[in-house]
Amino acid sequence: MNQSIQISVAKKTDADSIVKFYSELSNTSKEKFAPHDFTFEYLSDHILDNSNYVTIIAKNSITKEVIGYAVSQLWIFDYDMIRWKNYGVLIDNTEKNYACFAPSVLDNFQHLGIGSMLLSETKEILSRLNFVNLILWGGVKCYNIAAVKFYLKNDFILMGHFDYNGGNYDMCLKINA
């Protein structure tokens, strides 16, 4: 399957395809994945081609359909820094040590290694930008067992638990470990 998957940095010209991707996620997946607004305007004006974000897409090489999307924000929200401080982790956005990560793959393409491919490309880019740690954007829902297993398989470490619209885990990955 990996032979027919193309991984690349998303561009402004991919905005329509990313909006279509998001519209094709199941409602269950949308409940678990909503790091930002998925309108064409928001993607074009605030996310794509913005130096504060790294966006990676996975496309079906044959149909050119976006089947996976990962966005990394190159700074951490203040309220997240406060929560992470409770785990003994001091995050300072001026040091550019931490980025946050939110991936998703269309339901019928999950469990094929696409998420790992998105993560690998993200890590490579963030490493070149001298980032050291990758945390989950908004954590991961505790009931999302498949995602929790994915992160653990990919060497994320469980750091703590918080409540926001239900239980969530905070996890962290050393990018160059």
Over which residues does each language-model region extend?
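Active-site rim helix/loop that mediates acceptor-substrate recognition in acyltransferases
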Residues: K32-S61
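Conserved acyl-donor/pantetheine-binding loop and adjacent beta-alpha core of acyl/acetyltransferases
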Residues: T63-A102
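Conserved beta-strand-loop-alpha-helix junction that forms the acyl-donor binding cleft
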Residues: Q110, I135-A147, Y164-N168
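Conserved acetyl-CoA-binding loop-helix of GNAT-fold acetyltransferases
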Residues: H111-E124, K149, K153
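A short, internal acetyl-CoA/4′-phosphopantetheine-binding micro-motif in the GNAT/acyltransferase core
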Residues: G88-I91, C100-H111, G139-K141
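C-terminal "cap" of GNAT-fold acetyltransferases
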Residues: V148, K153, M159-A177
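Conserved GNAT acetyl-CoA-binding A-motif
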Residues: N97, L126-V140
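A short beta-loop-alpha structural element at the N-terminal edge
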Residues: S4-K20
